[in-house]
Regions:
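Short, structured segments at the rim of ligand-binding sites
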Residues: 1-129
Length: 129
C-alpha cells in the first residue's frame, strides 16, 4: 500500500528575476553542449568561455544556428544570442548530427515543445542502451 504524504501548507513558486554571474564547470563535452542548449533557450546574450571545438560542439552550434540562434566567436568566448524558451525557428533543412549523439539527443528535447516540423539525421551513432 502506498504511503500517504501530508503537506502542512501549500507549496508555491515565484518567478525568478534571472541568473547572472560566472560559473566554471570542469571541461567536458556534455557540459559544453548543455551550456549551448541552455544559452539558446535563454532570452538574451550568454558568453561561453572555454567551449571545445570537437564534433559535438560543432554539431550543436550548427543545429542551433539552423533554428535562428546567433552564435559568434568573440575575444571572451562564444556569444550565444538566445531566443527564449519557445523562440526557436523551424529549420529549413534536415539537422545533420553525423556521429554526434549527445547534441542530437539534447536537441530533440529542446525542440519537443515547439509546433514546427523538424528532421534529424545521424550516422554511426552509438547505441542508446
Amino acid at each position: 500500500m502506498p504511503q500517504q504524504v501530508h503537506i502542512a501548507q501549500p507549496l508555491t513558486a515565484a518567478r525568478s528575476r534571472g541568473l547572472s554571474g560566472r560559473l566554471r564547470p570542469p571541461a567536458d563535452r556534455l557540459i559544453g553542449v548543455m551550456a549551448l542548449m541552455l544559452a539558446a533557450a535563454a532570452r538574451g546574450d550568454t558568453v561561453l568561455e572555454g567551449l571545445g571545438e570537437g564534433a559535438d560542439d560543432r554539431a550543436a552550434i550548427e543545429a542551433l544556428r539552423a533554428m535562428g540562434v546567433a552564435i559568434g566567436l568573440t575575444d571572451d568566448g562564444h556569444k550565444v544570442s538566445g531566443l527564449g524558451a519557445l523562440g526557436l525557428l523551424e529549420p529549413r533543412a534536415m539537422l545533420d548530427f553525423s556521429a554526434a549523439a549527445t547534441p542530437l539527443w539534447l536537441t530533440l528535447g529542446l525542440v519537443a515543445p515547439h509546433s514546427f516540423a523538424s528532421r534529424f539525421a545521424g550516422s554511426d551513432l552509438p547505441p542508446t542502451g
